[in-house]
Structures are given as structure tokens and as C-alpha cells.
Regions:
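Carbohydrate-active catalytic/glycan-binding domains of CAZyme proteins
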Residues: 1-192
């Protein structure tokens, strides 16, 4: 670590589980002088590599920023609207604060969402107990837009889902070891 706030990428040899070659800085964060660009997630969507990450720590300046590149091993360009999501402008008394650390999810039917962390203040303070929140994502000019037309997390979110019931062999009195022993469905998991 060289003391700079950067996100790096380096090739991983999956057979030997070792890093190969030199690491390369691909992004320094969206905000000038940003602290803690962290928790990076990489996605390949429509020919671009997207790098989504948190900035500003886990307090009032917490946010989500994104950058993209056609190639993985080159400098990424930032979204012109970065940070693409934050509650920093809503004040400490807003019902949900410290929103950040997002992860994009596509439901297989073309609907996009972001799952993120945030806190609820109690009597003007935050215990920093973070909860998981979900918001809708749309795409404009190749960039994600979180909570379009709303700009903040909502109390409820309508989802296009059907009721799901776990199989009878799953019970609340079992530790479900057999479930966790199974290998992931290769149709659902990819490292490409």
C-alpha cells in the first residue's frame, strides 16, 4: 500500500490462486480529495466493466460512486453524476442516514436494483448499526440511476415477485447443514 486512496486491479491465476503481474490503479474516487474509496465491485455489462464502490467512510458523507471502462486494465472514467447515490444532503435527522456500499443486482427479467447499507438514527444519534436497503435502478446513457425521480431510499419498495415457500425439509429447528454443503449452481455463478 502506497498511502494513496486508490482502487487497484491485478490478475488472479485461478488454478494456483496467486496474483500474477503488477497491480494497477484504475480509479481514485469521484470526489476530489475523497477519503476511503472502498468496497469495490466489478461488473461486466453491455461491453463495459463497471466499478461501483463506496466513498466518504460510513458516516454522514457515505455515498456510492461508479466508473467504467471498455478494458479492465486501464484507467476508468467516472459517471458525470457521481456520487450516484447518497443521503449526505438530507441532514442528520432524516429517517435513513449514512447510505452507501451498494451492489448492483439484475433479477433475470431485466429489472435492476441496488442493495446498500444505511442506518436509522435514534433520538438524533446513530448507533452505526447498519441495515440492508433495496432501491430500483434504471439506466440512462449507459449509467445506472438509483431511485429515479425519488433520489432517496423509500420506506417500501414494490417488487415484481411471487410468494416463495421453502421446501418441507427446511425447518426452523435445523441448522440446514445439507443446504450449505452443496456446490453452487454453475448456471448462476460465473467469474468471467
Amino acid at each position: 500500500y502506497n498511502g494513496d486512496w486508490e482502487i487497484w486491479v491485478q490478475e488472479l491465476d485461478l488454478r494456483q490462486m496467486k496474483l500474477v503481474g503488477e497491480s494497477m490503479a484504475i480509479w481514485k474516487g469521484a470526489v476530489k480529495g475523497v477519503i476511503w474509496p472502498e468496497g469495490p465491485h466489478l461488473y461486466k455489462i453491455d461491453g463495459y466493466y463497471y466499478l461501483m464502490h463506496a466513498e466518504g467512510g460510513t458516516g454522514p458523507e457515505h455515498s456510492i460512486s461508479i466508473a467504467r471502462s471498455k478494458k479492465l486494465f486501464q484507467w476508468f472514467e467516472g459517471c458525470p453524476r457521481n456520487p450516484i447515490f447518497t443521503h449526505r444532503n438530507l441532514g442528520k435527522n432524516y429517517p435513513v442516514i449514512y447510505a452507501g456500499h451498494g451492489d448492483l443486482v439484475e433479477d433475470g427479467k431485466g429489472n435492476w436494483y441496488v442493495v446498500m447499507l444505511a442506518s436509522r438514527p435514534c433520538e438524533g444519534h446513530s448507533s452505526m448499526g447498519r441495515e440492508t436497503f433495496l432501491a430500483k435502478v434504471t439506466w440512462e446513457n449507459g449509467w445506472p440511476v438509483i431511485a429515479e425521480g425519488v433520489g432517496h431510499l423509500e420506506d417500501t419498495l414494490e417488487l415484481p415477485t411471487k410468494e416463495y415457500r421453502f421446501p418441507e425439509e427446511v425447518s426452523s429447528t435445523s441448522d440446514h447443514i445439507s443446504f450449505w454443503e452443496k456446490k453452487p449452481d454453475k448456471r448462476l455463478v460465473s467469474v468471467e
